[in-house]
From Swiss-Prot:
Residues 227-247 are annotated as: Linker. One of its GO terms (cellular component) is cytoplasm. This is Bifunctional protein GlmU. Its cofactor is Mg(2+). Residues 248-452 are annotated as: N-acetyltransferase. Catalyzes the last two sequential reactions in the de novo biosynthetic pathway for UDP-N-acetylglucosamine (UDP-GlcNAc). The C-terminal domain catalyzes the transfer of acetyl group from acetyl coenzyme A to glucosamine-1-phosphate (GlcN-1-P) to produce N-acetylglucosamine-1-phosphate (GlcNAc-1-P), which is converted into UDP-GlcNAc by the transfer of uridine 5-monophosphate (from uridine 5-triphosphate), a reaction catalyzed by the N-terminal domain. It comes from Aliivibrio fischeri (strain MJ11). Homotrimer.
Length: 452
């Protein structure tokens, strides 16, 4: 569909009590404005003009300077003035869609309906009926068709009784929009150039104005403070949870589940309470996720169990694995099939072979670990000398005793055993027992120091 979009994002957001622009506050882990940009890109917008006024450098850094055409509104003189800053870029014959960076839940379906509804030479306007329309511009109709929009501060008492309100979202043809914007005046209670005044201008020219309702009213709710943002967050999460339930995912408590990215699921997934999904996560069949787990940009294969309060980021977990509780898998961690990683184990940039186990209180970093290896409690791969990192290689069928330190670079060959409490500084040969311990000392009749 041939259209361009204008996203208004110049407001200060003073009620957010924040140093960053309002539209950069996140919903589901993503800046509000990015939700709107993604919707436009998904529908194939030819150009996306983002009108900003405050924190331009910060906005460009977070939203991506190349994704949109940046339009500065140096003075905030109203919505009509804001759109007019981008008007020189509009093609005369293209559809121009006006959206808002602080209205993040607008759906692709609603936008498509609005674009399709635009009458030739006229305007398609998104409206909604509210039980309490206080503060919103009212839709004025005459025998059915929309003829004008009156803002709350300019409305008569009779007009204030109208419950159909303007959302601000609309579509018009570029050439018409430029002409109507150029003719706007600020003769109103707020001394601003209202975008809504183009409705009356279109009517005066005999152009049709078609009103369209959103798929869901929550889509057009804006954010002015943190309470409103929290409300939209809960609405968004409830919708995501409902979709997953309908796809067969068992959410033990849908109200305590957060999806802040994308989730691809197999069959018979079980997710307990307070689980957070971030980035791109893929789950195979029969995966069970315990309470309080956080998953980000990871893949979990079939029949794997993630026990409570495990954090997995940038990792790959194979089939039939057990992780947790209280495990941290960091970027580059790869657990092969039937691997076990237990409580208070941290793994980074490590391949843990099939059937291998590290069940207790262990740090594994920058290591290649073979099959059927047992890593005892308190084992540390010492991979960093303060400037550089080094690799530990452990072969198949190795047993590493508790409280051992492996000082990289070092190799422990197939079948070797490292005795508990050892500090391994040299390579260990196949099927060798390596023990490194200080000589014991015993002092009879020892008296502990006492306070004087």
């Amino acid at each position: 569909m041939n259209f361009s979009a204008v996203i208004l994002a110049a407001g200060k957001g003073t009620r957010m009590y924040s140093n960053k622009p309002k539209v950069l506050h996140t919903l589901a882990g993503k800046p509000m404005a990015k939700h709107v940009i993604d919707t436009c890109e998904g529908l194939g917008a030819q150009n996306i003009h983002l009108v900003y006024g405050h924190g331009g450098d910060q906005m460009k850094a977070e939203l991506g300077e190349e994704r949109v055409q940046w339009v500065l509104q140096a003075e905030q003189l109203g919505t009509g003035h804001a759109v007019n800053q981008a008007a020189p870029e509009f093609a005369d014959d293209e559809k121009v869609l006006v959206l808002y960076g602080d209205v993040p839940l607008i759906s692709a379906e609603t936008v498509e309906n609005l674009l399709d509804a635009q009458p030739t030479g006229g305007i398609a306007l998104l409206t909604v009926v509210l039980d309490n329309p206080m503060g919103y511009g009212r839709i004025i109709r005459r025998n059915g068709p929309v003829i004008a929009i009156v803002e709350q501060k300019d409305a008569t008492e009779e007009q204030k009784l109208i419950k159909e309100i303007n959302t601000g979202v609309m579509v018009a043809t570029g050439g018409d929009l430029k002409r109507w914007l150029a003719a706007l005046k600020n003769e109103n209670a707020q001394g601003e150039y209202y975008l809504t005044d183009i409705i009356a201008a279109a009517h005066d020219e005999g152009r049709a104005v078609e009103a369209v309702h959103p798929v869901s009213p929550i889509e057009v709710e804006g954010v002015n403070d943190r309470a409103q943002l929290a409300r939209l967050e809960r609405a968004y999460q409830a919708a995501q949870a409902q979709k997953l339930l309908e796809q067969g995912v068992m959410l033990r408590d849908p109200s305590r589940f957060d999806l802040r990215g994308t989730l691809q699921c197999g069959m018979d997934i079980e997710i307990d309470a307070n689980v957070i999904i971030e980035g791109n996560v893929t789950l195979g069949d029969n995966v069970v996720i315990g309470a309080g787990c956080v998953l980000k940009d990871c893949e979990i294969d079939d029949n794997t169990v993630l026990r409570p309060y495990s954090v997995i980021e940038g990792a790959t977990v194979g089939e039939e694995c057990t992780v947790g509780p209280f495990t941290r898998l960091r970027p580059g961690a790869e657990l092969c099939n039937d691997a076990h990683v237990g409580n208070f184990v941290e793994v980074k940039n490590v391949r843990l072979g099939e059937g291998s186990k590290a069940n207790h209180l262990t740090y594994l970093g920058d290591a290649e670990i073979g099959k059927r290896v047992n890593v005892g409690a308190g084992v540390i791969t010492c991979n960093y000398d303060g400037a550089n990192k080094f690799k530990t290689i452990i072969g198949d069928d190795v047993f590493v005793g508790s409280d051992s330190q492996l000082i990289a670079p070092v190799t422990v060959a197939n079948g070797a055993t490292v005795g508990a409490g050892s500090t391994v500084t040299k390579d260990v040969n196949e099927n060798e027992l390596y023990i490194s311990r200080a000589k014991e000392r015993r002092i009879a009749n020892w008296q502990r120091p006492t306070k004087k």
